């Protein structure tokens, strides 16, 4: 028996494949099962092209057998098998694909899918074995052959006995090392799990003898083990079934089986696309957020299959971050994979799929908002913040996609409303979309700054998430209506009462306000008469793009730079406090400082900002009570 050498820079290339191409050792089982599936596909194709042949599906299956004691794992199939020449050409030449050659020779048309195209999948067996044997008998042949290799040094081929056509791959599993536990590939549960993970949707049965227990015949209280053959894989994936055959329960069961969440999905999306790139997908919109969703540990992505074989557990490139909550799978035969089937070679197809999926999710969410408002609001409660992050991120490049999905609490409706709904009922004289920022709806309703806008009869949107105002600043406008904070220096409201709108108030009290500004030097940019206050004595407004609420958010972040908004102290000259304030200016400068500090600190407290000196503040209160 002659030992032959591999025909492709044997040792170096084989070492490269074992050590570099495959990142997970368990992949070997996926590759060998995929090869077995290809072998049966080849017979199926022959029956389509040769009238004399018939294909009985029950005759075709894959059997996985393990022998823990002798450290042997066997993968057998009833596929087309290989002749001596094919064994030498396909297994003796690393990186030559018998499946690819079969496709070329038989001019395989579209719709007939063979998984293996690279000719290296078989060699993944050397990840877990240093003694690999292949026994094969070709379809229509009377001769069988045994191929054996112990690594890169070469291989042998010799005649052997085998009754039925097909192929058996026998692996002598390596001994454990300090770094690797090879025993797991001789464990029933592990093997079953790997098959379910990677090869669940191979279209032929993958069988194993599984350990069961039953009561002993002579003693029903004691149990004994026995073996029973079972089919491990599902074979027909749900996403390849006709949608009309499936019920909501089928999708919910699939969602649960995949451990996508403990709840039921709010929405499932089943789509099949044929075109430049063809794919099937089932997507789920969960009801509640995963516990780690808003943390760095959360990993977005869809399961990616190529021809029913799992390629990636979480393909993040298929989802934009703002739709990172979506769960599901994508299966395509058009992906350009590298030779390990683990990494995409070119991402053009993936980008096309991702673009289609993004549009599909957006359309489905808009449909949910329009037709099932209660469900959408439940979804938005869980994932609305992520949509707003999407508007803010990437310099607002996604705002046009997401703006119609946003919702905010309305002062008028006392419920969540969309921007479109807000704009549709704006009075003709209203120039801006008004919003107020606070920790809660209740806190916002008590803000002094909101009085003037509400008194005018305008609707105000309540922003209670840290991200809200940042997102709106990036959005800038909606349907040509700009956003305006109720805390802005200029509210842009026409027709205020004359005494409030006239600039004469500031002129009349110019010296008083200048004195107060000097007292608060470095704390406020200006002091002036308020045009917005009705019942409250004082408030803080801001000028410029950075609001007081944004200041609070930014300064709460790690490594903050003590960012400050430009603040303006506004005084309600019609409030009872203004008279003693003016009297103090005219006759008691110490009292003016006392009153000014009190009013400023009061405004800080209303905004939820920290008072610089709480002791001084309480002492000042005591002084005015004496």
Curated annotation (Swiss-Prot):
Keywords: ATP-binding, Chaperone, Cytoplasm, Nucleotide-binding, Stress response
Gene Ontology CC: one annotated term: cytoplasm
Cited SUPFAM superfamilies: ATPase domain of HSP90 chaperone/DNA topoisomerase II/histidine kinase, HSP90 C-terminal domain, Ribosomal protein S5 domain 2-like
Subunit structure: Homodimer.
Annotated family: Belongs to the heat shock protein 90 family.
NCBIfam families: PRK05218.1 (NF003555)
Stated role: Molecular chaperone. Has ATPase activity.
Protein name stated in the entry: Chaperone protein HtpG
UniProt organism field: Clostridium botulinum (strain Loch Maree / Type A3)
GN (gene name): htpG
